[in-house]
Amino acid sequence: MLGGTAEARALAAALAERDVPFVSSLAGRVSNPALPVGEVRVGGFGGPEGLAAYVRDEHVTHVVDATHPFAATITANAAAACTDVPLVVLRRPGWTERPGDRWRRVPTIEAAAARVAGAAPGTVFLTTGRRDLAAFADDHEHHYLVRTVDPPTSATPPRMTLLLARGPYSLDGELALMRAHDVHLLVTKDSGGSLTAAKLDAARELEMPVIVVDRPPLPEGVTAVESVEAVLSQLGLG
C-alpha cells in the first residue's frame, strides 16, 4: 500500500483486523509522520521500474494507492508499474461548494499564483504545502501567511509569515487565525477530507474569497474509489 494519508492508516487497520499481510510504503517527505499499524517501509522506489521490481521481487498480489490526491507522480508510477497486478486507487472525496462560498477554481498552482497576482494587495493565507511556495516567490505585492507541516526547502514569497502546524484544525481556531492576521484571501488545494476543511468554513463565515486548485487527473485508464470499504470490496474482503 502506497500510503501517508488518514485513509491509508484506516485501511491498514482494516487489513490488520482481517489478518491480511501487507506493507505500507511512505515517501518520507514529512518529518515525524503518523504511522499506520503493520509493517512500514520509508523512501521511494526509484520510479516505475523500481516499483515494478519491488512488486515482482516481494511477490505482491495487489497494490493500493492511498496517497495524497495531489501525489500525481506516485500515482503515475503505480499505474505504469502495475501491469501484472491489480491496482486500486483510494481517493477521499473532494470538497464541494456550499451556499455562501466565494470559490474560484483553477487547474494548477501556477494558475493560482497568477490569480493572486491580480488580486488587491492584502494578506493571503497560503495552505497548498511547502513544495508549491516557489510559484509565489515573485509576488512582492502581497503578504503571505504560509502554513506548512515542515519548513520550506525552496524559494518562498518575499513577504511571508511562516506557521508550522499539523491538522486537524477547528473552525474557532481558523477564524481566530484569519482575523488575527487580517487575511483577505485563502489559497488551498482541493485535498478533501475533514482534517483541514475548517478553513473553508471560516472563509465562508468571513465572506472571504477562496482560490481552490483542482486535483490533477488520474492516469489514463485508472479509476478511483472513495472509501476504505470500497477498497476492501475491490480486494474481495468486503
Task: Outline where the language-model segments fall.
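N-terminal beta-loop-helix "entrance" segment that forms/cooperates
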Residues: V23-G46, D101, A155-M160
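Internal active-site segments that recognize and position negatively charged phosphoryl groups
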Residues: E110-L145
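Glycine-rich, highly charged phosphate/nucleotide-binding loops
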Residues: G38-E58, L164-G173
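Short acidic-hydrophobic, aromatic-tinged amphipathic segments that line or gate anion-handling sites
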Residues: V40-G44, R102-E110, T223-V231
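Short, polar loop motifs at secondary-structure junctions
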Residues: S25-N32, L90-T96, G129-L133, R147-S154, ...
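N-terminal basic/disordered segments at the start of proteins
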Residues: M1-G28
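Glycine/small-residue-rich loop that forms an oxyanion/phosphate-binding "nest" at active or ligand-binding sites
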Residues: L51-A112
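Histidine/lysine/aspartate-rich catalytic loop segments that bind and position anionic ligands
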Residues: F136-P168
